[in-house]
Amino acid sequence: MAPGALAQVLGDLPNVHNDNLLVGFDTSDDASVFRVGDNLGLVQSIDFFPPMVDDPFLFGQIAAANSLSDIYAMGGRPSHAMNLLCIPSCLGVEVAGQILSGGADKCVEAGCTIAGGHTINDDEPKYGLSVSGFVALDRMLANSGARVGDALLLTKAIGSGIITTAIKGELIEQDEAAAMFDSMCTLNEAPIRLSEGLELHGCTDVTGFGLIGHACEMAEGSDVQVELASGAVPLFDQVLDMARLGIIPAGSYRNQDFFGPRVAADEDLESGMLDALYDPQTSGGLLIAAPAADVDELARRLHAEGRVAAVVGRVCEPVPGGPAVHVVR
């Protein structure tokens, strides 16, 4: 659903107040957090979508990694999950089994128990997880925690929406995008695991609203301005080439329509870069706000494990009447 339509629907919903609900949908966070102890929160999220690849096992891996990411984005660790599978009967049990096996593979890697699930017949396959986990409340992260002076760390390259659109249009072969699919299958656990002893202020995962959209939510939730250094943002191979050809997914245009009025971009950006920044991601990385020294140390630890980590911006004082996000070259 387009972000503007989603905001309208959620704004009209009645709800029952509960003091133990520490994070709900009103702050556009990645998951809910419900207090279950003095320093313990139950983190819950749900996510599912149709396939972007032909390989059912790979699809299951990507969908599960994407679902698990919301728990990591809150600073938590997933504990158990429920499968959600929509499958056409014509695809048969073998395809369904491969999708579920791909999801199970990522859950085992995450140490997350699959406790059950639900399946329905549908015209188009869709898969994902309802995931629960736990977080120490004094280590809980939210997209509203960014502070002026923080640096911003991004833990995966972007451009998956553009590249998968190019694959569907037969402009790129799927095997040319192997590094991108490996990234989409990679769990977002490492930045949280490796942040031990570091001070993190805010976090969100970069998914359907694109890097700009999620940065905008972080800026508005934290009452700050985010400056994105576009030249520092890691991109998958051929992203800018495809963007310059106009290979842009529909979700990118929806993101531009909704977030664009709150974004200012310098005129000297590299051609195609703004499209890449609005590009909706599947199983994208984490965008972390933290003091510069802690960001540098976390990046060093991630690089030591061979992982992507790029300082892509900073958190600034808000400008009255100004943009939530300022994109510079």
Language model segments and positions:
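Small-aliphatic-rich amphipathic alpha-helix that forms the alpha element of a beta-alpha
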Residues: 56-82, 98-109, 187-199, 206, ...
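Glycine-rich anion-binding loops of enzyme active sites
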Residues: 36-53, 58, 77-172, 314-316, ...
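Active-site glycine-rich loop that binds ribose-phosphate moieties when present
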Residues: 130-140, 175-195, 269
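Short pre-catalytic strand/loop immediately N-terminal to key active-site residues, enriched for Gly-Thr
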Residues: 57, 176-183, 201-202, 273-278
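A generic local secondary-structure boundary/capping motif
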Residues: 21-23, 31-34, 70-72, 104, ...
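N-terminal glycine-rich phosphate/pyrophosphate-binding loops that anchor nucleotide-derived ligands
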Residues: 1-73, 112, 147-153, 157, ...
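Glycine-/charge-enriched secondary-structure boundary and capping motifs
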Residues: 89-113, 120-127, 197, 207-329
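Short, compositionally biased
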Residues: 164-178, 305-308
